[in-house]
């Protein structure tokens, strides 16, 4: 498995034309509901086979790159395919299914602390769907108290639930790391968010996007976090930990 540094990770993100945020904010799994079909099409399902169940989520951040977390690239199942723009957990009847040609962990990833829990997938061909925007480097896109949305195909009930067949969304509030440190040990590569008891990420949501919505459509959505620690430990807790996309070192390129 290859790995990449903070600077080169950022270079990949911006060198391939990943969309960046141009700033203005809209106030959307467990405890949520199905999103309208044809929305959040930058959300990707990661699959072992072309038409099998998505076992992780991801975010299309350029036509040929998907951002996800480290647990999604071979620890349980091989990340052989991504399904982009699909509303459904499995099958090939909507969206597009594209083969993964390489997967890279961030070199800063620490399996003990969970720092830099980020991975990048490169696709065999460009996707026709619009990538999600990346956050600004000045911390202006992640503000404690702001509303955010989590989307994924994870369990909708726990512990005896099953994965959602349709893409789900739930609204969460971003917490300061100081407040969240009462529950978890955090660093600057993480962001904490929660929606109260019963509104959370769950099994199957790992790697999926935490979104800041800035308009009535999806074209200005920004991916600020990736489902990380919370979905691997328990479901339905008041707050969960996400990998912080702002911490990837984009500022080193003057973004």
From Swiss-Prot:
SUPFAM superfamilies: Trypsin-like serine proteases (SSF50494)
CDD domains: Tryp_SPc (cd00190)
A GO BP annotation: proteolysis
Gene Ontology CC terms: extracellular region
Subcellular location: Secreted
Domain Peptidase S1: 29-255
Listed GO MF terms: serine-type endopeptidase activity
Source organism, top-level taxon: Eukaryota
Sugar-bearing residue positions: 90, 105, 110, 160
Record key words, sorted: Disulfide bond, Glycoprotein, Secreted, Signal, Virulence
Keyword Iron in annotation: no
Pfam families: Trypsin
Expression induction: Expressed during infection and the expression levels increase with disease progression.
Signal peptide segment: 1-21
Cysteine pairs bridged by disulfides in the record: 56-72, 180-192, 202-235
Main function: Secreted effector that suppresses host plant glucan elicitor-mediated defense responses. Targets host endoglucanases and inhibits the endoglucanase-mediated release of elicitor-active glucan oligosaccharides from P.infestans cell walls.
Family in the record: Belongs to the peptidase S1 family.
Self-association state and partner proteins as the record states: Forms an apoplastic complex with host endoglucanases in tomato leaves during P.infestans infection.
Stated name of the protein: Glucanase inhibitor protein 4
Gene: GIP4
């Amino acid at each position: 498995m290859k790995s990449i540094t903070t600077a080169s990770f950022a270079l990949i993100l911006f060198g391939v034309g990943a969309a960046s945020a141009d700033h203005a904010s809209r106030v959307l799994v467990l405890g949520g509901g199905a999103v309208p079909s044809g929305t959040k099409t930058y959300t990707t399902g990661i699959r072992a086979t072309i038409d099998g169940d998505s076992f992780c989520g991801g975010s299309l951040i350029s036509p040929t790159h998907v951002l996800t977390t480290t647990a999604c690239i071979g620890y349980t199942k091989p990340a052989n395919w991504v399904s982009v723009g699909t509303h459904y957990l499995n099958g090939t009847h909507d969206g597009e299914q594209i083969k993964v040609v390489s997967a890279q962990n961030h070199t800063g990833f620490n399996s003990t602390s969970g720092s830099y829990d980020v991975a990048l997938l490169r696709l065999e061909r460009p996707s026709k769907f619009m990538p999600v925007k990346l956050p600004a480097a000045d911390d202006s896109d992640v503000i404690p108290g702001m509303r955010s949305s989590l989307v994924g195909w994870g369990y909708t009930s726990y512990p005896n639930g099953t994965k959602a067949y349709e893409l789900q969304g739930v609204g969460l509030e971003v917490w300061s790391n100081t407040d969240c440190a009462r529950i978890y040990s955090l660093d600057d590569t993480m962001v904490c968010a929660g929606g109260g008891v019963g509104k959370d990420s769950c099994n199957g949501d790992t790697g999926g996007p935490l979104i800041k919505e800035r308009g009535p459509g999806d074209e200005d959505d920004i991916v600020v976090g990736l489902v990380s620690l919370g979905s691997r430990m328990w479901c339905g807790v008041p707050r969960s930990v996400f990998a912080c996309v702002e911490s990837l070192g984009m500022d080193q390129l003057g973004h």
